[in-house]
From Swiss-Prot:
Residues 78-90 have a biased composition (Pro residues). This is Uncharacterized ORF2/4 protein. Residues 50-116, 128-224 are annotated as: Disordered. Residues 166-176 have a biased composition (Low complexity). InterPro entries: HEV_TT_vir_Orf2/Gyrovir_Vp2_N. Residues 129-161 have a biased composition (Basic and acidic residues). Residues 94-108 have a biased composition (Gly residues).
Amino acid sequence: MSIWRPPLHNVPGLEHLWYESVHRSHAAVCGCGDPVRHLTALAERYGIPGGSRSSGAPGVGGNHNPPQIRRARHPAAAPDPPAGNQPPALPWHGDGGNESGAGGGESGGPVADFADDGLDDLVAALDEEERRLQYPRETTKRTETVDERKRERSRSPRRDAGGLGPRAAPAAAPRAVSTPKRAQVPLRAVSQNPTGSPRRSLPRVGPEQWLLPERKPKPAPTSGDWAMEYLMCKIMNRPPRSQLTDPPFYPYCKNNYNVTFQLNYK
């Protein structure tokens, strides 16, 4: 089942649509702006492509042998392209034209209904998207480098005098020798459950006298302690003590000293 339908345009409209399609297909692959000259040069180089034709289709020129291709005249110089990256204006949909409207200058030409297709809007949207990809819009966000430091206002009440040259930077002061610091004592971990049961006390190591000697009374001296005291009195030639906690007394040692410091100050 064939889905082909007859075209909706007349002969001039079909010719203009075909001419416009040639221009657009050429502009998609080349930017010289002259598709006729380009096709002529390609035809001189490669010739007319051969291939099977449908039954009853006439050959080029009414016979099967193609005629010799003539070189086209050089067209007039193309106008200067407009400023910016806009493509050159195509020869249709202009601001004015002849009365017949064959060039598409007026909206009342034979291809007036072609402008209602929205093809121009589609092509303009594609051009805008391509231009946006080629030239991305600059972002206003400032990128700070690693070495950049924030400038702060000086606290000095003096202001720089106008017209004076830049002042020389003062010499850097020698760095003071850092004093050694004590090692930081690690803090005890805080309980993660403050509402729970209180923390248990740490177990004590050793007897009570080692931990709190001032708060506990000392034990009474034994017979062995007194025997050691009398032995030391015999050896050191001193009298015994009444209490073992008292300091010992040595009678042969002087307890009053007369010290004279002779300092030769001038």
